[in-house]
Amino acid sequence: MSLETPRTHYTSQIDIEQIGDDKVTVCGWVHEVRDLGGICFVVVRDREGRAQITLVKKKIDKEIFDAARKLVRESIVAVTGTAKAEGKAPNGYEIIPESIVVLNEAESPLPMDTTGKVDAELDTRLDSRFMDLRRERTTAIFKIRHEVLRAVRDFLSKDGYIETCSPKVVATATEGGTSLFPITYFDREAFLNQSPQLFKQILMSGGLDKVFEIGPIFRAEEHDTRRHLNEATSIDIEASFLDHFDVMEVLEDMVAYVYEQVIENEAASLKALDIELSVPKTPFMKVPYSQAIDIVNAESEETVEWGGDLGTVAEHTIGEHVFKETGESHYFITDWPTEIKPFYAMPYEDNPLISKSFDMMHRTMELSSGAQRIHIHDMLKARIESQGLDSDGFDFYLRAFKYGMPPHSGWGIGCERLVMTMLSVENIRDTVLFPRDRKRLSP
């Protein structure tokens, strides 16, 4: 199929002073039709915004006028005409059409409202995601998500990191545990990978020095909360000859840069979401684990023993404490007990009970985990076995530590949680085009 009237502009690109009397063609969805008898207004929507098409009955071809009045909402149209300044119209102009071509007429009634005038439940919107994406707020979230990932790549690439890709079908659990999706790989059992961790460490032995990956991870955890997904997008780095303090600095600087870029490049999307974003101040506050549990025990009804994990109540308590003290939402919890961190986290030499590990937190939830890694083969093998895992199953990983593995550190941060906390989105599923959670496998 070839278009007789190819698009010349997005609706946001039309500049009256530059275009003059030249013809323009916009293509998109019929957002609204207002028939006032002697005048008809058609609002056409595309990815970048809206354009008002103005038809005055006495000044336009009767066939075009009658066709415009009968347009079905959400039909696909191509409109060609002359743009004129009109301060009351979207983007400050209107188009006086010489042709309106219906490229595909929508059925009626629609599965959901796209104007934002009628609210719909999240599951209703996800069931008809193709319609939900036509809502300005939904589009804004995914434009910002795109900018977040673009900024991440830009920041890390400029800092000398090489983008890599690790396999998503693996034979061994990355970090132990049972939260894996088993699959059949020809005649063998395999799993969907829960993290690129082991592979990015192997790359340190290969001499790539500093790497990053943006890709899917899979967790077979039966959470059913607003903060959890079973398929998510993880942003990971690994870097040789850097310790945990070094990579914490990389992480906080990257987060600040991402916020800067979103503010600079997605002002219209932020406006659509009615959000005024500010750049987090660096360096982020560092709260040792021992101090964190003291805060929880003193300021909440929850009690956390040393060596216990931090739940939702604890995270909120610490987050509020930090916010009151600094006015900032981002901070680190450092120096976690070795036994509750993954086997590859490096213990302190003078106190092996504490690891060189950290979580980067937002006021409302955990965003990232990282650590300096164990780079000594025998120590790493012993840690694997101390957690009840079979070291033979990690041979492909351990071999890389026998022949010259440099000291290295790294972290992973969830893209969805980063976007969710940035935009104060209530449910993490709103930050994924087609989310996979405990109950949803389609669309």
Swiss-Prot record:
Which reactions does this protein catalyse?
tRNA(Asx) + L-aspartate + ATP = L-aspartyl-tRNA(Asx) + AMP + diphosphate
What is the source species?
Answer: Methanococcoides burtonii (strain DSM 6242 / NBRC 107633 / OCM 468 / ACE-M)
State the similarity comment: Belongs to the class-II aminoacyl-tRNA synthetase family. Type 2 subfamily.
Keywords, alphabetical: Aminoacyl-tRNA synthetase, ATP-binding, Cytoplasm, Ligase, Magnesium, Metal-binding, Nucleotide-binding, Protein biosynthesis
Superkingdom of origin: Archaea
**Name this protein carries in UniProt:** Aspartate--tRNA(Asp/Asn) ligase
Upper classification of the source organism reads:
Archaea, Methanobacteriati, Methanobacteriota, Stenosarchaea group, Methanomicrobia
**Annotated Pfam families:** tRNA-synt_2 (PF00152), tRNA_anti-codon (PF01336)
How many and how are cofactors bound here? Binds 3 Mg(2+) cations per subunit. The strongest magnesium site (Mg1) is bound to the beta- and gamma-phosphates of ATP and four water molecules complete its coordination sphere.
